[in-house]
A protein has these predicted regions:
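FMN-binding flavodoxin-like domain, especially the glycine-rich phosphate-binding loop
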Residues: 35-121
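N-terminal beta1-alpha1-beta2 submodule of the flavodoxin-like/Rossmannoid cofactor-binding fold
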Residues: 1-51
Length: 121
């Protein structure tokens, strides 16, 4: 089990590192897709769109993704974290969490618990 993160400013990367699993960045690291399932942490941009870099990963590997957490800005109202809603709808990947910035400690615990409950300790 590992985490893939799509982070523009580094805040989502900081959130990902709090969870306690190996972290790989889209477009920066060699991602070991052959090592099984992963959890995705991505972001919304343009008021709720899915980043192209995330779409490229999901098109090829969505079957191995057990869940997604998405960063966003609450100032966007109904578009807050909307990329996560779209990923859930298009790829049928459970949206586990929406968070702002680098998230709070209790939010990273939500993701960690979700992963552990699926037998990925």
């Amino acid at each position: 089990m590992f985490i893939i993160v799509d982070s523009l400013t580094g805040l989502s990367l900081r959130f990902a590192r709090k969870i306690g699993y190996p972290v790989y960045q889209i477009d920066k690291d060699e991602i070991p897709f052959d090592q099984g399932e992963f959890f995705l942490i991505t972001r919304s941009f343009n008021f709720g769109e899915i980043p192209i870099s995330t779409i490229r990963v999901l098109r090829k590997h969505y079957q191995k993704c057990i869940g997604v957490a998405v960063s966003g800005n609450r100032n966007w109202g109904t578009n807050y974290g909307a990329a996560g809603d779209k990923i859930q709808e298009i790829y049928k990947i459970p949206l586990v969490l929406k968070f702002e910035g680098s998230g709070f400690e209790h939010e990273s615990e939500i993701v960690k618990k979700y992963i552990e409950e699926r037998g990925h300790e």
